[in-house]
Design a protein with these regions (language model features):
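Eukaryotic scaffold/interaction segments
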Residues: 1-219
Length: 219
């Protein structure tokens, strides 16, 4: 259920509550109670998003991109380890404005950003022959947006610019290499890359689809 709710795959509030009611007859009270809290969290998150939009209008603030935020209680939703990440400037601005709103509204609550798990976005390209729209993880977008400035980076440079740990960075690069958007300088595999290894943008990238989901595992 957590995966469906966080990723917007739910069939609707009524359907989810109906499923929980059916589970009530078969499962322990604590488990069913947690499911109910998760559903309430989703409703509260939507209300918070509405309040944020009102805050933006009231302060005459505009965001540089479409920014969809979900806030859940950590006790109700399982979460993975937090990843250190230097966000792209445009996204960082959105985060800072939301934190300003949230800290003012709920001064006793602390936000932990899960960039490495359910965080997703869409990025439009204008550097290839076709105008692709890539659905990517926040980590993938952070790396790809660096190639607006240069066509080639060393692993060490990418690590410094993104602040990602080397293991996380290599996983991201491996996914982008498999997607044939990036390429290694000497045809190295991700496991063989070093700080001095070179990663370049594949300017000849070609795909039959204009909307490409690179957030999913590449076969």
């Amino acid at each position: 259920m957590a995966h469906r709710l966080v990723n917007g795959m739910s069939s609707g509030k009524e359907a989810e509550f109906s499923m929980v009611e059916k589970m009530r007859l078969k499962l322990e009270f604590q488990y069913v109670s947690k499911l109910n809290r998760m559903l309430k969290d989703v409703a509260v998150s939507k209300e918070l998003a509405d309040k944020f939009n009102h805050f933006l209008a009231q302060k005459h603030l505009s965001l540089p991109l479409v920014f969809d935020i979900q806030v859940f209680a950590s006790v109700n939703f399982p979460s993975s380890n937090f990843t250190n990440l230097q966000l792209p400037t445009l996204l960082q601005k959105c985060v800072e404005i939301f934190e300003q709103f949230h800290n003012t509204t709920y001064p006793k609550r602390k936000l932990h950003w899960l960039h490495n798990s359910h965080s997703r976005g869409e990025i439009l390209s204008n550097c290839f022959k076709k105008p692709y729209c890539f659905k990517a993880t926040t980590l993938q977008m952070t790396v790809l947006l660096l190639f607006n400035s240069l066509d080639t980076y060393s692993i060490g440079e990418l690590a410094e610019l993104t602040k990602l740990g080397i293991n996380s960075l290599l996983q991201v690069l491996e996914s982008l290499i498999k997607a044939k958007i990036l390429i290694t300088g000497n045809g190295e595999k991700a496991v063989d890359l070093t700080n001095d290894s070179v990663i370049s943008l594949v300017k000849e990238y070609d795909n039959g689809r204009l909307h490409v989901n690179i957030a999913s595992p590449t076969k």
